Regions:
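Terminal-tail/helix-coil boundary detector
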Residues: 1-2, 207, 231-266, 281-285, ...
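Aromatic-lined glycan-binding groove of carbohydrate-active enzymes
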Residues: 197-235, 270
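N-terminal binding-site loop/beta-alpha segment at the start of enzyme catalytic domains
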Residues: 1-85, 151, 355
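Generic structural signal for well-ordered alpha-helices
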Residues: 45, 68, 72-75, 113-117, ...
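Glycine/proline-rich, positively charged
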Residues: 26-27, 33, 94-196, 200
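Conserved, mostly hydrophobic/aromatic
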Residues: 6, 18, 41, 48, ...
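Structural preference for beta-strand elements that scaffold enzyme active sites
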Residues: 13-17, 54-55, 84-88, 124-127, ...
Length: 355
């Protein structure tokens, strides 16, 4: 297990982060993500800690607080020293029917953080993340509230999830101007079947030294191979039969799985492990969040850290999963093709370059 720097902070987190969306499952998507009880959740956390995972991610909205409760109880029951684990949670989702029980307003943030601390049985949250982009709250209001929490010692660092690149830049511009705590991490969907963030978010995160925390690296289990016919896999309905998320191009995803299978066979590992290794080996990824419904699934995912794909294997997967560049990226690439001098004579005029 390697440890990577969390954004521009001095904190280090394991390259694998345990996700807790499978804990409880009550009142959350009808339990289709997972329905682990306290004993089962505790065993997953214990196994993760044994594998030297020091990073756990949850959210107040997961099972309407039950996931946070179970996480906190597990850490207490296991006698985990608080400084040995980096605890991350999130705020935004609807926790009650009232008009202000959702969002990234100062009111909702301040109301929510104390409840999260209570459920987690801790006096501080290491990484407090705004779970979604709020179209109705000014960014400065959100950033001021988060900075107040940092100054009060209730949270240590600020992160966001599912935000647009421009909004993160705006947030940190405000933070720099006002002396607020900056956004240090972005939790984003990324997988072989979902590479959207490479176009805008990745260049921004690399330029600004913002950590990338990846959720759903297997695209809701699709890249485990159990939905794609062929090979030795048995096609199963799985989670996507009831909750078809995140959205993917299933024809392309099937082609990706078909490319994953021979690589997995060559290494003697599961298809899922290869897909996770591809994500983990991307230089901009700080930590990959994995969830599990049982210990066997968790153990297979944890073993991804011991698998290193060759440059040729990565190139093969890059090619089969490539997405068409969006504007203005294709235009910038086209017009920078001859930007770097090669030493060869420059030809002026003539036909335009090919697309």
């Amino acid at each position: 297990m390697k440890y990577n720097r969390l954004g521009n902070t001095g904190l280090y987190v394991s390259e694998i982060c345990l996700g807790t969306m499978t804990f409880s499952g009550q009142n959350y998507f009808g339990g289709v993500i997972g329905t682990l009880n306290q004993k089962e959740a505790t065993s997953l956390i214990e196994r993760s800690l044994e594998a030297r995972v020091n990073f756990i991610d949850t959210a107040n909205v997961y099972s309407l607080g039950e996931s946070e409760k179970m996480t906190g109880q597990a850490l207490k029951d296991l006698g985990v020293k608080r400084s040995d684990v980096v605890l991350a949670t999130k705020v935004f989702g609807r926790m009650a029917p009232g008009p202000n029980d959702i969002g990234a307003s100062r009111g909702h943030i301040m109301d929510s953080v104390s409840l999260s601390l209570e459920r987690l049985q801790t006096d501080h949250i290491d990484l407090y993340q705004i779970h979604q982009s709020d179209a109705r709250t000014e960014v400065e209001e959100t950033m001021r509230a988060l900075d107040d929490l940092v100054r009060q010692g209730m949270i240590r660092y600020v992160g966001v999830s599912n935000w647009e690149a421009w909004k993160i830049m705006k947030a940190n511009g405000i933070a720099d101007k006002r002396g607020f705590a900056r956004v240090e991490t972005m939790q984003a969907y990324y997988s072989l079947a979902g590479r959207d963030l490479e176009q805008d978010l990745v260049p921004m995160m690399q330029d600004q030294t913002i950590g990338c925390l990846v959720w759903s690296p297997l695209s809701g289990g699709y890249l485990a191979g159990k939905y794609t016919p062929g090979g030795d896999a048995k096609v199963e309905p799985g989670r996507r039969a009831n909750f078809d998320f995140p959205p993917i191009d299933k024809e392309q995803a099937d082609r990706i799985v078909m490319a994953l299978r021979p690589i997995a066979k060559a290494h003697g590992v599961s298809v899922a492990r290869v897909a996770l290794a591809w994500v983990r080996q991307k230089p901009f990824v700080t930590s990959t969040i994995i969830g599990a419904k049982d210990l066997s699934q968790l153990n297979d995912n944890l073993e991804a850290v011991s698998l290193t794909l060759s440059p040729q294997e990565i190139a093969t997967l890059d090619e089969v999963s490539a997405e068409r560049p969006q504007y203005p990226h294709w235009m910038a690439k086209r017009n920078n093709a001859t930007r770097v001098p090669t030493g060869e004579p420059v030809k002026m005029g003539g036909p335009p370059p090919k697309n």
